[in-house]
Amino acid sequence: LDAKSFYLVDSGGQYYEGTTDITRTIALGELTAEEKEHFTLVLISMLRLQAVRFLYGCRGLSLDYVAREPFWSRGLNFDHGTGHGVGYLSSVHERPNGIRFKMVPERCDNGILEEGMITSDEPGLYIEGKHGIRTENLILCKKDEKNEYGQFLRFEYLTYVPIDLEVIDREIMSERDVEL
């Protein structure tokens, strides 16, 4: 590997305790300002989705904008779903939960997000001929506050693998993004 740009590792495994799916992007040397910006946008996207609260009855289509807004506000996008359901000793891509901005009927992944569902949170950015970046954690859907508006849910992250902090461009992060 050359000491430049990024190395993207997408890995996982099947265990009696569950199925894992993770992606990390690692810097292999000095990066350009654009590479640092893109790495940071991917991280912001993942963190914002991981921190969202939502009412029961919500589907991934309703949450996808939270993850894509950092890209769309800059005229950027990634051409894959933001997340997919993760099975237990079955398929790493499992129905019925998923997070994407448009319907893909053959995926059958537009189910209501339920307590106990595990979903990947994996935004990315791919610039043809330059670099590809993705950061993926698994998130668990959990009950949160219940009030007069209904039952709120939230995500708890399940992935504890470090992220390359030296690559982050804090100048483009809001105070809230840094806190996440």
Could you describe each region identified by the protein language model?
Residues 1-180:
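Active-site neighborhoods and metal-handling regions in enzymes and metal-associated proteins
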